[in-house]
């Protein structure tokens, strides 16, 4: 908080009070570290799918599932979930230690939300994170590792 106060030319107490007010009305919530999932032997997966219209029952099911932390019990770590407008309605970014666990989570979601998910689903694994949590990857140049090596014939 001292650095923020210094950069904004405020007193620390004023900056602290603004932070508390923003926390109180949930303008800001949760303080997290950005984790390189690959360095802890996990793979990031992105699941996108279309849904039927949102109903109260569907919303209740989503809230119940997210507040019981059931995915954690299965070895899955939820990174982000968005309800969107566009080609897909739901975007879920999660990590798992292997493809079998990731696929099992995907199948579990399909089963739980079977009355709401339309057939279009897209499951991808992430090769490299360029920006995560609003932070540019400090090892950004590792993207060059993905460039195919061309060997002369």
Regions found by a protein language model. Name each.
Residues 1-153:
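A compositional/biophysical signature of low hydrophobicity enriched in polar/charged and small residues
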């Amino acid at each position: 908080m001292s650095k923020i106060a210094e950069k904004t030319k405020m007193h620390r107490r004023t900056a602290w009070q603004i932070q508390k007010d923003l926390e109180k009305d949930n303008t800001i919530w949760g303080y997290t570290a950005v984790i390189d999932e690959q360095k802890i032997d996990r793979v990031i997966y992105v699941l996108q799918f279309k849904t039927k219209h949102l109903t109260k029952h569907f919303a209740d099911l989503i809230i119940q599932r997210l507040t019981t932390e059931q995915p954690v019990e299965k070895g899955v770590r939820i990174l982000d979930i968005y309800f969107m407008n566009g080609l897909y309605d739901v975007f879920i970014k999660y990590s798992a230690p292997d493809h079998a666990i990731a696929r099992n989570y995907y199948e579990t979601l399909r089963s739980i939300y079977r009355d709401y998910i339309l057939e279009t689903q897209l499951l991808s694994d992430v090769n490299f994170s360029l920006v995560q949590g609003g932070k540019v990857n400090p090892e950004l140049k590792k993207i060059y590792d993905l460039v195919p090596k061309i060997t002369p014939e």
